[in-house]
């Protein structure tokens, strides 16, 4: 399947938010974690709308026939749909955006939580091998360079078999904002820190908000991991940080 067709399937399963008016609007793509699309991400979508963006809360599972149970059993355990394969969704939605009059397809901001952050990182790290790595025959790494202006990585998975720490992004990429949790019992903070340090060494601009007392999924009041502790105060801080990242990205253009 070609990018635009897969992008249509992805967006048909996803939820789109828009500011008032006809646009074209810059667009924030919001990628869920391994447990699937959950309601708390819609609060981040609203933050994007308040910053003047349209937002798409991307559902990567429904078009693939992955149920919530199977996501927990197989995606969260790393058995299926590694980040580099899910990265196909990014290339596809970027292609789809170019067909939408309401979207400014060349002012895109990517935001990923946990597994969604992994997908963003592997999309960049796959480089010129994007088509082979993602399985999307026309996946074009130039889309990332020309259409995406900023990225937010929230407690991203960055261990094996993630590509960023080992390969980097080829010294090319948008400004990166990140949120790490000091008591993250799922992805930790050391592996994500190493990946971000690699990007910094490669010359990218990287900014980090570190919540020392936060667990994984601290911003999700319905987290599927019983070890997660919901922190509404840190959720608010992270939404504010996201809003600042969105605004600064537009202001820098």
Description of each model-found segment:
Residues 165, 188-198:
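Short alpha-helix in the alpha/beta-hydrolase fold that links the catalytic acid
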Residues 23-25, 30-68, 160-161, 185-188:
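Short substrate-entry loop that stabilizes the transition state in hydrolases
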Residues 204-253:
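C-terminal catalytic histidine-bearing segment of alpha/beta-hydrolase fold enzymes
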Residues 182-185, 213-215:
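Acidic beta-to-alpha connecting loop that harbors the catalytic carboxylate
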Residues 172, 178-180, 184:
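Short beta-strand/loop motif that positions the catalytic acidic residue
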Residues 35, 39, 61-84, 217-223:
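Cap/lid segment of the alpha/beta-hydrolase catalytic domain
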Residues 1-23:
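N-terminal cap/lid segment of alpha/beta-hydrolase-fold proteins
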Residues 88-171:
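Primarily recognizes the serine-hydrolase "nucleophile elbow" in alpha/beta-hydrolase
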